[in-house]
Amino acid sequence: MKSGQADLFAQASGDSDLLIKPMNQLQIQDWPPRLEGLSETWLEILNDFWRSPDGLSLDQKMKAQLATGQVIYPRTPYRALTLTPFDQVRVLILGQDPYHGAGQAEGLAFSVGMGQKIPPSLRNIFKEVQRDTGAMSPEGPSAGSLERWASQGVLLLNTALTVADASPASHSDWGWEVLTDNIIKAIAQRSRPCAFLLWGAHAQTKASLIEIANQAARPHLILKSNHPSPLSASRPPVPFLGCGHFGRVNQWLKAAKQNPVDW
């Protein structure tokens, strides 16, 4: 094991063969995820989902996979909801599914755990933040964690909340999207306006969901661009690099007499 990687792994208690497992791996004893620390509205949405046919089906799939020893990330699927209570959501940044490597996913879209190398998409996000707002890219072992955004009311939501190791989008059709669609609709329907940042074709499919849910014509801000991935960040029709979303969000917040986000 390379120097600096030891903190990303932990010995699985009770394993006779002393398997070493990533710290961010979802364990069978962690399922179903704990609900402590979640706001009342998040609890209502989650409980309604897990009682539904889609939720029951997803629960069975997760239990079956964990029972076979399938490596699944992250250990904390609800972390975005825990860090950003429903009534504090000011901005929603929509991702697709968690990073699928050991130590990476930490339950926040685009964010990576302590000591992890910053992925290319997140590197482009920081690059655009600096270009748009002048904020310097973070440094140090926690540089890739976006927890500081989440604590300011930025909900970093993936449309699927788990993924199998080394298998991108492996849980994208398991039913998570029913839950996350309900979360998006609940935010669009509440009285407090929200800025929705939709990067890439997958995220932009949710624009109509937001508009349909927003029957009261609340003054939400919906911003679209290409995905920050190097494959699309500089391409038309709306390159991510140069989109100016971070500055526009702060202008919108200031106009609504709210504090800007410290990106």
Enumerate the language-model features and the residues they cover.
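Short, Lys/Arg-rich amphipathic segments at extreme N-termini
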Residues: 9-12, 27-33
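Short linear clamp-binding motif
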Residues: 1-15
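C-terminal catalytic domain of photolyase/cryptochrome flavoproteins
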Residues: 6-9, 218, 258-263
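A polyanion-binding, active-site-adjacent surface
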Residues: 22, 26, 36-210, 214-216, ...
